[in-house]
């Protein structure tokens, strides 16, 4: 049966990097018989220029009807003066809401060939391969709030942290299912020594664990987890945590790899999921053909794994990326003397040749 992929290039380098990822998907399709077809739509500043909105209804409808969404990047200086509600970045927020994307998966894997680029010591980084599973639509970011009120003669503001058992149950099950595809370990991160919501979080995760006895579970307080990511990141397999903690830990973990051009993410929904690199639209290099496509190509691998359940194809794409790097190919963001200088096209070709 044919699987439909909605491709949303977006702005800046988005077109170049999504073209690279689609080329790799097509090669994987030919190798593994995936029967993929592609449907292209606008979002971000490009859509605003054409339609007066960063997320046209047609784009959202196409995304909802697809088997997976491959997203490039949005934004740029060109749209800095646009009304805030119409800024390019509103496109991704609208897609998250419209698709009901409840979890964000942030893989952090450091290829042996890239250990030297990490700010951490090589002996700490070698072998890092973890995934942060972050709850995306609950918690303090979506709770009640007050910007300003007077109480006891002082101005104050407040935000409400709120989690329900079903919300935690859903994200915990995703974390355990993810661990089953990997090394079989989940670390649940909370602040249960202080926060009531974290105590509910921990109780619920432990209850869900009863259905996943083949997966190991441990718990860390968020402050300790932040330290452990810097001290011994190889200890982690799957980290499961709430929205606020996950936001912070994901950005900390992203630094471990040494290049934002390599980083990818998956936003998981009940029906359709969205896959994108974590870097921006880089308008300063748009059209120059020098953007690193690997983050987007690895996003396509996540699409194969999580939306299409094509694990062999996903692993083959990831292995091809690792092999191209091991053979010395480097885009300008990673190039140093002694390596093979590559642009977007030649790096993509190097990966295709190894798939």
Ranges and model annotations:
Residues 45-47, 229-329:
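Glycine-rich phosphate/nucleotide-binding loop
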Residues 21, 25, 205, 296-307, ...:
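Buried hydrophobic packing segments
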Residues 1-5:
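Extreme N-terminal starter segment of soluble prokaryotic enzymes
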Residues 11-14, 67, 133, 175, ...:
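Buried hydrophobic positions in well-ordered alpha/beta secondary-structure cores of metabolic enzymes
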Residues 49-158, 244:
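N-terminal glycine-rich phosphate/adenylate-binding segment common to multiple enzyme folds
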């Amino acid at each position: 049966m044919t699987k439909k992929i909605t491709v949303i290039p977006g702005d800046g380098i988005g077109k170049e990097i999504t073209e690279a990822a689609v080329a790799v998907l097509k090669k994987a399709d030919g190798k593994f018989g995936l029967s993929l077809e592609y449907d292209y739509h606008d979002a971000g500043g490009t859509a605003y220029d054409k339609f007066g909105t960063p997320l046209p209804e047609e784009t959202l409808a196409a995304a909802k009807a697809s088997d997976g969404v491959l997203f490039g990047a949005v934004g740029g200086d060109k749209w800095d003066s646009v009304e805030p509600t119409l800024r390019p970045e509103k496109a991704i927020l609208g897609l998250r809401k419209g698709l009901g994307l409840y979890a964000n998966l942030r893989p952090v894997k450091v290829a042996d060939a890239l250990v030297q680029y990490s700010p951490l010591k090589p002996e700490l980084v070698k072998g890092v391969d973890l995934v942060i599973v972050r709850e995306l639509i609950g918690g303090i970011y979506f709770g009640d709030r007050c910007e300003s009120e007077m109480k006891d003669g002082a101005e104050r503001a407040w935000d409400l942290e709120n989690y329900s058992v079903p919300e935690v149950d859903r994200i915990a099950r995703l974390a355990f299912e993810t661990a089953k595809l990997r090394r079989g370990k989940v670390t649940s991160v909370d602040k249960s020594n202080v926060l009531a919501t974290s105590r509910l979080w921990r109780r619920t995760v432990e209850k869900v664990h009863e259905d996943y006895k083949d997966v190991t579970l441990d718990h860390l307080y968020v402050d300790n987890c932040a330290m452990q990511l810097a001290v011994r990141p190889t200890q982690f397999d799957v980290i499961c945590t709430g929205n606020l903690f996950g936001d912070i830990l994901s950005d900390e973990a992203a630094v471990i790899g040494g290049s934002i051009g390599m980083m990818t993410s998956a936003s998981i929904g009940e029906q359709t999921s969205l896959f994108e690199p974590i870097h921006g639209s880089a308008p300063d290099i748009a059209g120059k053909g020098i953007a690193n496509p690997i983050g987007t190509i690895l996003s396509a691998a996540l699409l194969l794994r999580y939306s299409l359940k094509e694990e062999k194809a996903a692993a083959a794409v990831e292995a091809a990326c690792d092999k191209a790097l091991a053979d010395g190919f480097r885009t300008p963001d990673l190039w140093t003397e002694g390596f093979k200088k590559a642009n977007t096209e030649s790096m993509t070709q190097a990966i295709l040749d190894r798939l």
